Regions:
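Conserved mixed alpha/beta catalytic, RNA-binding, or beta-rich assembly cores of soluble enzyme
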Residues: 94-184
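Active-site beta-loop-alpha junctions enriched in small/polar residues
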Residues: 43-47, 88-90, 134-138, 167-171, ...
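Hydrophobic faces of well-ordered beta-strands that scaffold small-molecule active sites
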Residues: 40-43, 83-85, 129-133, 160-165, ...
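Cap/lid and interdomain-hinge subdomains that line or gate substrate/regulatory clefts
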Residues: 30-48
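Conserved small/polar residues in nucleotide/adenosyl-binding loops
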Residues: 1-5
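Catalytic-face loop-and-helix region of soluble metabolic enzyme cores
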Residues: 163-240, 245-250
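Solvent-exposed alpha-helices and their adjacent loops that cap or buttress functional pockets
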Residues: 33-34, 76-77, 121-125, 155-156, ...
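Acidic, His- and aromatic-enriched active-site or binding-groove loops in soluble protein domains
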Residues: 10-26, 31, 57-83, 105-114
Length: 255
């Protein structure tokens, strides 16, 4: 399984790293998605590419390994979209609450301007950041974990609401367990919990994942619409997840 950095970094999957072309392809893809009336979300891995695609992103995520990164917190402070910070890989939520507080403030730092020139950037702060529970040494999507996380948010004088990542450590990296996770989340919501406002699910058209090594494996031999990174649930299971969550939202509205 190829741990690639994404479409922008190596768009042709051949180690040519045509980042310039990757930016164009990614931007065109996002334009087409937006034209369909669909909001697009993205994880922000670096602090430069958002200048080229940020206007087409409605929601962004900062990963567990970069939530502590000062430059990513500065980036989040200037993005015109809600940003989710994941808890640490050990399950520590404090690094995420610290990140939210840091991103809510204005910052000054070196970055690039929309024309690609180096510039001194001043941000106003982003009041729309939140925590994403992705599990740690143990899963943290269950009701006691959600309650504990919301208590920590309240103690940090932040809104006690959050998003849950159904994959990664919450699914023990078993993609099909995402259905079990969403059922538990739906049960909490159906009882009236308003602490959970969203979920992340690793989903694709075809379930599972396929092995791929750039420079070794043939790109043309890849199976269409199946992940080459993390294993995902397929289209049919994705529909089940959406239906389960939809019913939970309806039940919550009646409480």
């Amino acid at each position: 399984m190829y741990k690639r950095q994404g479409l922008i970094n190596d768009p042709y999957l051949d180690e040519s790293y045509r980042i310039d072309e990757g930016l164009r392809i990614a931007r065109q893809l996002l334009i087409e998605i937006n034209r369909q009336g669909l909001p697009a979300g993205s994880e922000f891995l670096d602090v430069i590419s958002p200048q080229y695609i940020g206007d087409l992103i409605s929601w962004g995520a900062i990963g567990a390994r970069t939530t502590e990164s000062q430059v990513h917190r500065e980036l989040a402070s200037g993005l015109s979209a809600p940003i989710g910070f994941k808890n640490g890989t050990d399950g520590n939520i404090k690094i995420a609450t610290d990140a939210i507080q840091a991103a809510a403030r204005g910052h000054h730092f070196l970055s690039v301007h929309k024309n690609g020139q180096v510039a001194i950037v001043q941000t106003q702060g982003n009041p729309d950041c939140h925590v994403i529970l992705r599990g740690g040494k143990v899963p943290n999507y269950d009701e006691p974990s959600v309650n504990a996380a919301c208590q920590d948010l309240t103690a940090a004088k932040l809104p006690p609401t959050l998003m849950i990542d159904c994959s990664h450590a919450n699914s023990s990296k078993q993609h099909e367990r995402q259905l079990v996770v969403t059922q538990e989340i739906a049960a909490q919501m159906s009882k009236g919990s308003r602490q959970i406002f969203g979920v992340m699910v690793e989903s694709h058209i075809e379930g599972g994942a396929q092995k791929f090594t750039p420079g070794k494996d043939d790109v043309n031999a890849l199976k269409y619409a199946q992940s080459i990174t993390d294993a995902c649930i397929g289209w049919a299971d994705s529909e089940k997840v959406l239906e389960t969550l939809s019913k939970a939202v309806e039940a919550r509205r009646k409480k």
